[in-house]
UniProtKB/Swiss-Prot annotation:
One of its GO terms (cellular component) is cytosol. It is found in: Cytoplasm. This is Translational regulator CsrA. The keyword Cytoplasm applies. One of its GO terms (biological process) is positive regulation of translational initiation.
Amino acid sequence: MLILTRRVGETLMIGDEVTVTVLGVKGNQVRIGVNAPKEISVHREEIYMRIQAEKGDNEASGNKV
């Protein structure tokens, strides 16, 4: 895992097309902005895990998503 320190307004690059910008810090919360092409899905981890679980449930029951 790469660990970086960024200040509000600073950005990091992931590849050539994805940027992550620190928008704000308040207490123990950090607001970030992600710019990525439409074909790259961006989800919070808990949403991604729910999507994967639903895919697995649908595949197990023979349904296509």
